[in-house]
Amino acid sequence: MSHQHTVPVTVPAVVQESLKTVCSPAQTQQEQTKQPTPYPAQCQVFTDTQEKGFPKHEEKEANPVKDLPEQESEHHQQPGPQKQQLQVKKPEQELQEQELHSEKQPQEPQGLLCLGQQQQREPQEQEQHLRQHQQPQQESQGQGLCLGQQQDVLAPQELHMGQHQKEKLQEPELPLGQQQKTPEEQELILGEKQQKLHLVERHQEPQEQELHHGQKQKQQQPQEQELQLVQHQKQKQHEPELCLRKQQQQESHERELHLGKQQQQESHEPELHLGKQQHQESHEPELHLGKQQHQESCEPELHLGEQQHQEQQQHQESCEPELHLGKQQHQETQESELQLGKQQKPHEPDMVLDPKEKQKLHDPELHLGKQQHQESQESELQVEKKQHEKSPEPELHLGKQQELHEPDMTEDQKEKQSLHEPELHLGKQQESHEPDMTEDQKEKQSLYEPELHLGKQQEQQIEYEGYQRSKSLNQLLKQEKASRGQELDDSHLEQEKELLDQRLDQELVNKDEQLERKKHKLENLTQKEKQIKQLVPSTDRVQETQPIQPVKEDSLTTKKQQHSHEVQ
């Protein structure tokens, strides 16, 4: 009896439909007739209050558990009119119960199949229900109501079980076979109830988990949005700071590069400037020395030739004894050897110079030695420039100084001076006749004179030492120098002549071109004048212009002749 009343209470509507399809109509009629006892008054009151108390929940939710109170009410209403019939037909019902109990055993596997289908359908319906109701509060309320309904359903079941037990105690007429079967039936009913409760709990657990996940997701979404907003704000705050830092770093790097470039340029500029100055200074004295050597190489040869000619005349005119002449000749040979030896030391072996010119070259060296201890490097460079640019002192000044500052000289030296006097005279004449000497050279000579006064004594000592050493060398080199000097002089003269000829030719060509232009202009003028004469009668002005034309041509020819004479 208890089993007949518990099945329609716990099984939902979906399972009832499946059971109806599986079970035959004869069985359903038997089950309806097997309900002799109605629900007690307490169960009926609870169902009424349950229907009145939760109308909203039945409207909102589509949970399969909401159909349970309606089913219970239907079952409660069914036994009302059947009460009298069941009381009349008790012995018939007992027989039917025995038959049902025998048939119940094969129907139990069908009930298990229905439960498996129910388990598969229930989670799908629950998922649809959760998708429709997204708000967590409504879902929590629905769960609470469902649990309350289940508890309410279990309470009348327990009451109903108690009533069944009382009825069984009051019915002593039941056969012994039935009484032995009742505890077994009770055990089966309890096992089924436990299974159903366990299934309901299993269905509720995924619902609670899904709700919990939904709540977590909803809580996490605003938190993630807040975190994103905070990160975005932080990035916005940090971006200007990063930009400023980058700009500052770039500016500092650019300044460092700019300063490095300036320092490099400043360090290179003085080096380049010094290099240029040194290069110019090194080239200027070389050019100046080359010019001096070329001039000096030409002058001493002429000077030596004139000396030899004058010495021969003096020997013929003198009536002194032969010993005196021998001494003079010996001294003259020694002097010539000294001159040649001294010229070799400062200059190349091909160049021929006088001893006085050698002294002039030694004087700046001594002067530089003194200045190196007194002045700095800059003054040394300036002095070197001056020394290279200065021209040699004239020969007259040296001769006069030697006469004044050498009173202790022997008679032989006096005779040498008397022989040098005509050379000095010739030097004067050469200086007077040299057109190439400029005012700048004279100023340099005047600046060069005080330096010679300082190194006179040292030069005398050097002359005596060089005199002894140069005797053996000069005799061998005289002939070679003479031949080489002539060849060099000839080559230099030829080169100079060629250069002068080229310049003159160019000048003549330019002048010829200018003359031709002037002639063309004159011809044009004459043609214009003729045209004017034809149109206008002749006047005094036109007559004056005609005799002037040949005069211009004459002046041009005279200028050409003068220029050619100057070139020659």
UniProtKB/Swiss-Prot annotation:
Keywords (alphabetical) are: Cytoplasm, Keratinization, Phosphoprotein, Repeat
- Which GO biological-process labels does this protein carry? keratinization; keratinocyte differentiation; regulation of antibacterial peptide production; response to UV-B
Q: Which domain of life is it from?
A: Eukaryota
Which stretches are tagged as biased composition: Low complexity? 25-36, 78-88, 107-121, 133-154, 172-181, 217-232, 457-467
Region named Disordered: 23-499, 517-568
Name of a matching Pfam family: Involucrin_N
Query: Residue ranges under compositional bias (Basic and acidic residues)?
Result: 49-77, 89-106, 193-213, 266-333, 345-456, 478-499, 517-532, 551-568
User: PTM details?
Assistant: Substrate of transglutaminase. Specific glutamines or lysines are cross-linked to keratins, desmoplakin and to inter involucrin molecules.
Keyword Transmembrane applies: no
**Tissue-by-tissue expression:** Keratinocytes of epidermis and other stratified squamous epithelia.
Give a GO cellular-component term. cytoplasm
Q: Which residues carry this modification: Phosphoserine?
A: S472
Query: Can you say where in the cell this protein is located?
Result: Cytoplasm
Q: Which family does it belong to?
A: Belongs to the involucrin family.
Described purpose of this protein according to its UniProt entry: Part of the insoluble cornified cell envelope (CE) of stratified squamous epithelia.
How it assembles, according to the record, is: Directly or indirectly cross-linked to cornifelin (CNFN).
For this entry, the protein name equals Involucrin
Gene for this chain = Ivl
